[in-house]
Amino acid sequence: MTDLRHYDVIVSPAITEKSTLVSENNQVVFNVAKQATKPEIKAAVEALFGVKVTAVNTLLRKGKTKRFRGFVGKQKDVKKAVVTLAEGQTIDVSTGL
């Protein structure tokens, strides 16, 4: 798989309060493409960051219905991946991809 395809799999790091809490357990959270599979996510993280991945857990957050000035809209669905790294491995997501 080429580097360009790896960048299509990993959309962005998810920087939230919960993701900073799980970072203490050698885990990193990424927003990923909806059609990405766990093996693709594992291969992309290992290739782009040069780390060993032990597990990948995914979740699909459904978009919320929101109102703006009386008009009803919907946020997009987001797929997230919680990537568990091997012992002693780290990724600094604050510097960007």
UniProtKB/Swiss-Prot annotation:
Described function: One of the early assembly proteins it binds 23S rRNA. One of the proteins that surrounds the polypeptide exit tunnel on the outside of the ribosome. Forms the main docking site for trigger factor binding to the ribosome.
Pfam family, one: Ribosomal_L23
GO terms, molecular function: rRNA binding; structural constituent of ribosome
Keywords for this protein: Ribonucleoprotein, Ribosomal protein, RNA-binding, rRNA-binding
GO biological process, one term: translation
Membership in a protein family: Belongs to the universal ribosomal protein uL23 family.
Gene3D superfamilies, per database record: 3.30.70.330
Protein name (Swiss-Prot/TrEMBL): Large ribosomal subunit protein uL23
Gene Ontology cellular component terms for the protein in this record: ribonucleoprotein complex; ribosome
InterPro entries in the cross-refs: Nucleotide-bd_a/b_plait_sf (IPR012677), Ribosomal_uL23-like (IPR013025), Ribosomal_uL23/eL15/eS24_sf (IPR012678)
Subunit structure: Part of the 50S ribosomal subunit. Contacts protein L29, and trigger factor when it is bound to the ribosome.
